[in-house]
Swiss-Prot record:
High-level lineage: Archaea, Methanobacteriati, Methanobacteriota, Methanomada group, Methanococci
GO biological process: isoleucine biosynthetic process; L-valine biosynthetic process; sulfur compound biosynthetic process
Family the UniProt entry places it in: Belongs to the TPP enzyme family.
GO molecular function, one term: magnesium ion binding
Name of the molecule in the record: Uncharacterized protein MJ0663
Organism whose genome encodes this protein: Methanocaldococcus jannaschii (strain ATCC 43067 / DSM 2661 / JAL-1 / JCM 10045 / NBRC 100440)
Keywords: Thiamine pyrophosphate
GO cellular component: acetolactate synthase complex
The keyword Disulfide bond is assigned to this record: no
Amino acid sequence: MGGNIKFLEAMVDFLERNVKTIFSYPGEQILPLYNEIEGSSIKNIMVRDERGAGFMADGYARITNYIGVCLATAGPGATNLTTPIATAYKDNSSVLAITGRCQRKYIGKNYFQEVNMDFLNFYKGYFVDKAEVSYIAKAFADCLFNKKPVQLNIPVDLYKEEAKDINITTYTDIYKDDETPSNNIKEIDVKKPLFLIGQGIFGTLSYKEIVKISKILEKINCPIATTFPARGVINEKLENCIGLVGRRGDLKSLLEADKIINIGSSLSYNTYVESVREKLLSKTENIQLKPKSIKELKEFFENLDVKNSSWIYKNSNKFQPSGDYSNKIYEIIKNIPEDAIIVTDAGKHTVFTCLLKTCVIPRNIISSHSFGTMGFGLPASIGVKFGTIDFNIDREVVLISGDGGFLMNVEELQVVAENNLKILMVVMKNNSLAEFCKIKNPNFNKIADAFEIDNCYIENVDEIGSEIKGYLKKNKPLLVVVETENEPLPKPNI
């Protein structure tokens, strides 16, 4: 790009080079950018609520291991992003939130929709006060390399100014992630070693590289456990894979191990539960890895010598469905492809899905694992679907949601309908919010009819298989409403 150009044009040129899809909702203070994106090569997905834009960007980021971008106007548009950005912050997801602002001369002067926008800076935010493309590049780099959400707040009068540093066309032009974490560990010489793998092992690997990690890990001569978001990084059917550990997983293996080698886990209270936390921390060795290529990861494990490990640990805590709710979840899981991307909301359905699903590939389950956000499921599954399209990921997308969470962002069914997104959307209708209280529900099937989305209603568990098989043969969305009885959750490890 040469010559004198406006900041708006330079910004969209940068976005075109680095982004395929943006999730947005228009508004006065962001309208110049919104309109310019509409005329670009970027897919501009208009959501029906800014919360949907944030959650879609989050789902997109999680499946692609890249950046998900959302766009919202100033004031109420930006405040609607608060919960999605908080979710991305807690769950370590690369979401870039581009927000509008009034003209600079009105900032701090009680102007229409003007508020301090720092509330979105959970990790970091940039107030763009100069027409410099470097702001955008820095925001991209911070977002991608640190796996955290970043806000880019732009006053509306800045778009007309002449752009500076237009030679910057991608985030790598100004940001070189040359950091090579130093790991002194070369050998592991204990009788009962255990590897704990968290999602940090994904680094900045591409999706195609991430799915190859299992082949590397299966050669390690000791048990391997994972955190919730890292499930499937090693196939849970393999002999040396324990699977999920912690609050909703196996705890005995962590206690029996002589040493725990942690790669990529933040060691949250979901993984190291409070009752044994200090004991587990005392025997944990943390390895800092931020792999930028699968080759780098392969070389690390090839040079790591695991000595004297004859320990074979079998996870005997496999949960079996026993009630109406868990049996119906299990029937859904049995009838979808084993590599399907299951997106859950927050609630009982998430716990049962977690307990009943054997994960065979990374991102087999995507959930708000650290923030527990209701309303996450539907828009996140939409973002996941767009991610699979943009990055040629040939996997089915399945939403399993509760009735309470589904209603929180039900308006985003319009995005599903407009784009004919093939998503299997399951609503577990038990007419309650977990064990908290009973709720009254609308007719979900009539809601689907209003959006002109195919739908069905299921009462009996033996109806589930045929409906899913029929769906898999078609190329359009389906909403499945599953009437179910309540069922108490098994007690977690605490």
